[in-house]
Amino acid sequence: MRRVFLIFTLIIVACGIAFFFLTKYQPHIVSPLGQLIEKPLDKYTIANLMKRQFIGSQIVLDDAVATTSAFTSYRFHFTSDGKKVTGFVHVPNDASEKNKKPVIVQFRGYVDREKYTPGEGTKRSSEVFANNGFVTIAPDFLGYGGSASPSADVFEERFETYTTALNLIASIGSLSRVDPSRVGIWGHSNGGQIALTVAEILNKPIPAALWAPVSKSFPYSILYFTDEFDDHGKALRKRLAKFENDYDVERYSLTNYVDRIMGPIQIHEGMADEAVPQKWSDELVKVLKDKRKDATNAAELNYFIYPGADHNLMPAWNLVVSRDIQFFSKYLR
């Protein structure tokens, strides 16, 4: 009996030792799914913005700042992703809840923050559009006018221009004198880049007029202009190196999603433009034509080149804006 008890005890001890070593030295297997951690700027990839539903907010018209016989200009504000964004809106005087007007959403080009004044880059064209029966609305963007501060991250600040634009378009229906089913987009320079990206994300037949648009791939589209920086872009390139280490830049580049632009497009380019090379617009038009050549009902594509015209389309400005009035009237009336 004692012998049986001893054997039983030895078996128990042996099992305990075996269990100890098996559990202590067994390789630790980590599920690859557990390492798929979303990074902060992943939400701004064009593909992810396509999936997002933009709900919008109330556009609040603040005090009227100017009134003419044809329209009234207001400062406005709305909320974009929890941040206040201000801007300018021009409303034809005959607009009402029973006579709703089409709207042109305008995106300006780059302006130095310290030199910016509300309406800069859009005010002159918006007044002409309003004179011709269109409501126009242009955001200052975060960090400008009376808007809240943008992200401290230079790349997120850029991506916030897209979400601001998309939230603004989603908010159009809150204006009682505007017909939200008749929306056009206008963009100049970097605002053209915003307009193109918005058109890709929305993937709707929205008419867009683009003046000398920045249309190259990201991040080349920003590196191109760094020779104007005090440090010639050294700090930005350093941040970009880190960004490229963490993210796939191709997922943020509008050039990879041009086939999603569904609406009619009208592009204007000055042959004497020293800010945006004419060849950029030449290449954009070629890509758009190639993407649309097999479409059964391809949307209209107009491309106008102006000899001697600069980045602001001077001295052809009057002709350019008159062509845009005809263009928007065709699709929004």
Predicted region positions:
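C-terminal catalytic histidine-bearing segment of alpha/beta-hydrolase fold enzymes
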Residues: 293-333
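Short alpha-helix in the alpha/beta-hydrolase fold that links the catalytic acid
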Residues: 263, 277-287
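Short substrate-entry loop that stabilizes the transition state in hydrolases
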Residues: 96-101, 107-148, 218
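Hydrolase active-site cap/lid region
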Residues: 196-243
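N-terminal targeting or regulatory segments adjacent to alpha/beta-hydrolase or S9 domains
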Residues: 1-70
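Short beta-strand/loop motif that positions the catalytic acidic residue
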Residues: 261, 267-269, 273
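Alpha/beta-hydrolase active-site loop
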Residues: 155-176
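N-terminal cap/lid segment of alpha/beta-hydrolase-fold proteins
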Residues: 53-98
